[in-house]
Structure formats: C-alpha cells, structure tokens
Amino acid sequence: MFSFLKNHPFAVEAFFESSLVLTFAVAKEEVQHLIPECLELDTFRDKWAFIAVAMVQTKSLRPKGFPKIMGNDFFLIGYRVFVRFTTSAGKNLRGLYIIKSETDKKKMEFFGNIFTHYNYSTTDIIQNKQKEVTEISSIKSGFQIKIENPADENIPLPPSSPFADWKEARRYAGPLPFTFTYNPADKKVLIIEGVRENWKPSPVKVIDYQFSFIDQIHLSDVTLANAFIIHNIPYYWKKGRIEKWNKAGKNSRAF
C-alpha cells in the first residue's frame, strides 16, 4: 500500500566523517548475473567489471533542510556493482547497483527499509584506530579490513590491479553520482542522484582484508583493484526519480 515510500520520496543529507571504498575487479562474465536487465556493466578494457565495498561513517543523517539536531549518526556498509544506464533522453549515466546494505543501528535499518529498496540489515561494527593503522571488522558479517592511514599518495597500487596508475584507478573509486534500483514487474528504474563537493579521495594501502559476502557470491577470480578514503565531506541525495525502461531502448519518464 505504501510501497511508493521506498522510492526516496525526499532528499536526504549527511556529513561523511569518513568514506573508505575498496574496489574489486572481476571478469565481466561473472558479474553480469548480479545486475538487472535494464543496466549494463561499467567495464574497463571490455574485460573487467567492478564490485565496490563502501564503509561510511555518517553524521547527522536527516531529511534535507531539517536541523542537524534531528539527524542521526550511522555506520553504513554497501556492496555495489559499477553500472551504466541509458535514460529516455539518451544520456548514458555511470552509477552503482546495490547488492547488499548493512548498518550498525536498528534505527537506520528500520527507516532505511521504509524509504529505500536497499534491504538494510543490522550488524556489529568494530573500529580500531591507531596512529598508523585503521582496522574495521564485524563478527556477525564476517569481514575485516586493515589499512595504513595515508600519509602521502606515493603508495603502489594493489598487486594484480588492472589499472596502470592511480589516475586511471580513480575512475572506479566511487561513489558515483547515480544509484539505480529496478522493479522488473513494471519495468521501472529508480534513479537516485548524489551530490558532493571537493571529492578528492586519497589512495590507501590495504594491509589485509576478508569479506564473507564476496566469498559467498562464488566468483572464481576476485582482484583488489584500488582503495581510497576521504574525510569530512558534506553529501546529499536528491529525491528519487523514475523512468520506464523499454528493452528497445525507448525509455519514458514517469515522474
């Protein structure tokens, strides 16, 4: 009855205290089944598709325009595939398709699942920050990541990364401007646009990592392609908009 509420009916803003994103390269044939028919994989050299894990510490997350005191602080984890979508106007949008979402608080799970299609679940988050190393882990979700705190950008790309340099790697750093959700029953695509300024993520050296969810997808060859972090950035998401998808490529704007 109130399913329309899941379509991001209002803009939302937050302050990102930190956003750490690890991007993994996978052969495109192995990722295709993870995305809906309306989207295309955003590939590199027509060979690699990408799955990113984003870990974001938000502050004062709230409907846009509301006072900060009404906001809440949450830790958010998102597993996303890099994709493209062609709009009814013929624009080719780069964005993300979310395949799993987690948070550290039940309140975010509750309201997130009312106002989005992201199917949040609550998990434990353990953060251990020392002078040179930051570790983030979860017992329930079975993940652990340890990085060196960036002192400069003169660090090497991860071994076996498909990118030649960090400049090339930044194209797949995330988050991208758009996030997409698809309803196969009525062939409608929900488009969420994120807006930020001064987005200049810094490369980080990953000491160790393990993500049970990535293991559970059963991909045969997953390679860490890059890792970036950014601090203290205001961010907001516009109200969602919907387009009717036509397999022949003639999309129509719904509202």
Language model features: what each stretch is:
Residues S60-G142:
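Aromatic- and glycine-enriched beta-alpha-beta binding-site module
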Residues K6, F10, A25, N92-L93, ...:
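Low-complexity, intrinsically disordered regions enriched in charged/polar residues
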Residues F10-A11, V31, A54, T58, ...:
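Aromatic-enriched hydrophobic runs in primary sequence
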Residues H117-F255:
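Interaction-surface and assembly-scaffold signal
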Residues F15-E17, A25-V31, I51-K59, G71-F74, ...:
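Short linear motifs at secondary-structure transitions and domain/linker junctions
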Residues M1-K64, V195, W199-S202, Q210-S212, ...:
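Hydrophobic, proline/glycine-rich low-complexity stretches
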